[in-house]
C-alpha cells in the first residue's frame, strides 16, 4: 500500500505533464512542417526568391521588423504579429500565402499559428 501511495503523485504529475505538452504548440513538430510547405518558398533561405525581405526560417530574422516596418512574429502577442494578421485577413492583396503561391492553410492550421505565437513562438 505504501508503494501505491508514493507512486500516485508521480503518476498524476506525469499525466498532467502529458496533457500540458499536448496543448503546447511546438515549432519543429507543429509549425515548421506547415511553414516548409507554405511559407519558406518566398520567406526562406534563398535570397533570390525571398519576398519582402522577410526570412521566416531563422527565428531571429522572423522577430525583426521587415521592409514595411511590421514585425512578422511578436512572441506572446498574436494580435501584433504581422504573420497572424496576414493569415487571417480577408483582404486578398494582403493574405498569406498569396494566391500566386497556390497554397492555403486550413482554419485549424491558422489557429495553430495563433496559439504558437500566443505561447511565445518557441
Stretches found by the model and what they are:
Residues 16-122:
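Aromatic- and Gly/Pro-enriched helix-to-coil junctions and flexible linker segments
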